[in-house]
Amino acid sequence: MSDILSRIETYKRAEIEAARAARPQAETEAAARAADPVRPFAKALEAKIAAGQTALIAEIKKASPSKGLIRPDFDPPVLARAYEDGGAACLSILTDGPSFQGAPEYLIAARAQVSLPVLRKDFLFDTYQVAEARAWGADCILVIMAAVDDALARDLVEAATDFGMDSIIEVHDEAELDRALALPSKLIGINNRNLRTFETTLATSGRLAPRVPKDRIVIGESGIFTHADVKLLRQVGIASILVGESLMRQEDVTSATRTLLNG
């Protein structure tokens, strides 16, 4: 695990214990089961792909550790509607505070304004966080293979499945991809960012995508800024993308989303 992920795991585990002390797991799971019905995340991507379109997971992100503040004018419900109007298939919403200035309230408020399924974008180290995500209304979780071992990854995916949620399994290299393919999830995210150097290259997607079986959906993540990037990924068989920063920096998010998808 990289030094960055080790630091993140330390504060996340402290957050989890504080949250569990404030609301025990059984109570959180009960809230999860009473939450608004799950919106099928993978099916929303499949529908766009079946229609010959690029399935965009549009990210609502205020800041990042590498870039600092990305969008000062940050209004999650307004951004959610802009993405939906622009043709996004799903939303990704940061709930991590220390590194990304995210919050659960952003997910709750944004999801209430749209009909799109929503990913809780965060660093998950405990099944408590899966119950928490569903209680807030999330329809999908992210499992980062660079941050967890195989047993924990499976526990997270199975917890999500138990709540009717989907899971994106994120990988950065061949070894992580091999581990990810052993998990019962249809969604494989290829992150083009090197977690040690923070450099991005779409060549990562080009290298890994052909290794993924055709019954999975491959999602390109990081380093996607233009319609040319989208076309490049489609050439290697990637018809779904997760994009945040490049859209968050635009004044007219709806127009920028349409341009990214359609040119």
Swiss-Prot record:
Pathway: Amino-acid biosynthesis; L-tryptophan biosynthesis; L-tryptophan from chorismate: step 4/5. PROSITE patterns: IGPS. GO terms for biological process: L-tryptophan biosynthetic process. Coiled coil: none annotated. Pfam families: IGPS (PF00218). Its EC number is 4.1.1.48. It catalyses: 1-(2-carboxyphenylamino)-1-deoxy-D-ribulose 5-phosphate + H(+) = (1S,2R)-1-C-(indol-3-yl)glycerol 3-phosphate + CO2 + H2O. It comes from the Bacteria. InterPro entries: Aldolase_TIM (IPR013785), Indole-3-glycerol_P_synth (IPR045186), Indole-3-glycerol_P_synth_dom (IPR013798), Indole-3-GlycerolPSynthase_CS (IPR001468), RibuloseP-bd_barrel (IPR011060). CDD domains: IGPS. Keywords: Amino-acid biosynthesis, Aromatic amino acid biosynthesis, Decarboxylase, Lyase, Tryptophan biosynthesis. GO terms for molecular function: indole-3-glycerol-phosphate synthase activity; phosphoribosylanthranilate isomerase activity. Belongs to the TrpC family. HAMAP family: IGPS_B. This is Indole-3-glycerol phosphate synthase. It comes from Azorhizobium caulinodans (strain ATCC 43989 / DSM 5975 / JCM 20966 / LMG 6465 / NBRC 14845 / NCIMB 13405 / ORS 571).
